[in-house]
Amino acid sequence: MYIQILGSAAGGGFPQWNCNCVNCKGYRDGTLRASARTQSSIALSDDGEHWILCNASPDIRAQLQAFAPMQPARALRDTGINAIVLLDSQIDHTTGLLSLREGCPHQVWCTDMVHQDLTTGFPLFNMLSHWNGGLVWNRIELEGSFVIEACPNLRFTPFPLRSAAPPYSPHRFDPHPGDNLGLLVEDTRTGGKLFYAPGLGQVDDKLLQMMGGADCLLVDGTLWEDDEMQRRGVGTRTGREMGHLAQNGPGGMLEVLDGFPRQRKVLIHINNTNPILDEDSPERAEVVRRGVEVAFDGMSLKL
């Protein structure tokens, strides 16, 4: 299984266009040793030619341009994208679909709840129906697993995560299973397994068991501290309120990952305020000391 990190930042990217926090300002001033990052998205393949896009960020055009296999040039109009899987209906995971309209029809896999959001509060399916067949919905059931024809050796097992629907959603304050998903992806030839959960607010025993059976854990790296947004003066909500488990402290993501010494562990969906973006910070050093990697745009993994 080929795993390509197209984008590794949380919503807004890094540096965020309107932010002058210590990280964003330091990057622009050249006083911070860090890499710019686009908004979170990955691509998966079983042969390096046919790719499944997981989430479509607003930065999708630049992400595809930076990864040559996404333009195989086999025809006058071509793409390496063969299907799209949406883990939720968040704006920073779906607006990239608008930029992909010239390539319609696209096979899009998502849950009933995500499809409902994307036909009501943010009606992308309706809007893009006017472009050559638009978005073709394939339902993700919350039980069992599924295979996408373009990559027949990859088996996807979805699992619901506890988190809210987007602010625009008609059921924002009425959460349902299927609003947010993680994925366990297995290459049935190699046996390699990826646990992918870029929005992980709570880890229960069932998830711990799934993580223990995976070879690579690609998980939520949004915040270092739960109250980081408040500390930095850029927001009022905590990580838990937004559905993100912070890395630091008792019960934090690093402590969770300490329990998996065998697995490759990678943090993704990193907010612009997170000090681990600073490659010289003590927080980054602590992450490295504990055997955890920080995802970057263009990172390639293979299982």
Curated annotation (Swiss-Prot):
The cross-references to Pfam families, in alphabetical order and at most eight, read: Lactamase_B_2
Q: Is Transport among the key words of this record?
A: yes
Per its UniProt record, what InterPro entries does this chain match? Metallo-B-lactamas, PQQ_synth_PqqB, RibonucZ/Hydroxyglut_hydro
Listed under GO biological process in this entry are: pyrroloquinoline quinone biosynthetic process
The record, for CDD domains, names: PQQB-like_MBL-fold (cd16274)
Q: Which SUPFAM superfamilies match?
A: Metallo-hydrolase/oxidoreductase
Top-level taxon in the UniProt lineage:
Bacteria
Name the keywords, alphabetized: PQQ biosynthesis, Transport
- This chain's protein is named Coenzyme PQQ synthesis protein B
Source organism lineage?
Bacteria, Pseudomonadati, Pseudomonadota, Gammaproteobacteria, Pseudomonadales
